[in-house]
């Protein structure tokens, strides 16, 4: 069995029955989802759905998520354009651009970083992109569907984890939650995919893929 991220490449679906391609940009997108956030607030913060703090957390997450994906449109359009031009990563290393160099992320607002313009201009120059080409790429990107699913997963998960970490800090310092929640177990490090794996969404297509292969192995 082989697992690959879709990225912005042409779909590999159907090439081999042993190949599974993510239905989103990458595996990280399966973590950075509202449903996952809801589960973590309940399980790791010990806040049930009936509590006023739960509603506040979810409301703020939804607002900040919308702001973040709107802000990341230009960056993702450039990443999409690079994939259309070449499958080489030699021109621009999108993965090396820190999300914190694009946006300052907080529970209260999403603001462009002071480095944003510099980072975007460097990419545009490296790709030799015109404003017209960028506009066309943005239009094509919008057709792909939900940005939370189709935008670069690493950046989406950076945003997701930043909010969770800040909520944990606010629980310790006060000023956000109505009460201090004493059962917060959340700990996110550089090993975040493993640490949050129990909460990640499992697409139906992945369940079907695994089931079919387990049946073959058992036969």
Locations of regions flagged by a protein language model:
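Acidic, divalent-metal-binding catalytic cores of TOPRIM
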Residues: 1-219
């Amino acid at each position: 069995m082989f697992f690959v991220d879709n990225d912005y490449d042409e779909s590999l679906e159907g090439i081999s029955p042993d190949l599974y391609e993510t239905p989103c940009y990458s595996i990280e997108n399966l973590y950075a989802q509202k449903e996952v956030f809801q589960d973590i607030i309940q399980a790791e913060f010990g806040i049930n759905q009936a509590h006023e703090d739960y509603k506040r957390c979810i409301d703020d997450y939804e607002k900040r998520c919308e702001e973040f994906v709107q802000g990341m449109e230009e960056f993702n359009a450039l990443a999409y354009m690079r994939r259309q031009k070449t499958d080489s990563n030699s021109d621009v290393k999108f993965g090396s651009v820190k999300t914190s160099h694009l946006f300052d992320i907080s529970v209260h607002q999403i603001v462009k970083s002071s480095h944003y313009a510099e980072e975007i201009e460097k990419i545009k120059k490296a790709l030799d992109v015109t404003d017209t080409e960028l506009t066309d790429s943005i239009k094509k990107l919008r057709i792909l569907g939900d940005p939370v699913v189709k935008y670069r997963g690493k950046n989406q998960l950076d945003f997701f984890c930043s909010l969770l970490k800040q909520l944990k800090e606010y629980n310790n310092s006060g000023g956000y939650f109505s009460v201090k929640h004493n059962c917060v177990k959340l700990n996110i490090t550089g090993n975040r995919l493993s640490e949050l794996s129990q909460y990640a969404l499992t697409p139906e297509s992945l369940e079907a893929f695994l089931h079919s292969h387990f049946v073959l192995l058992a036969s």
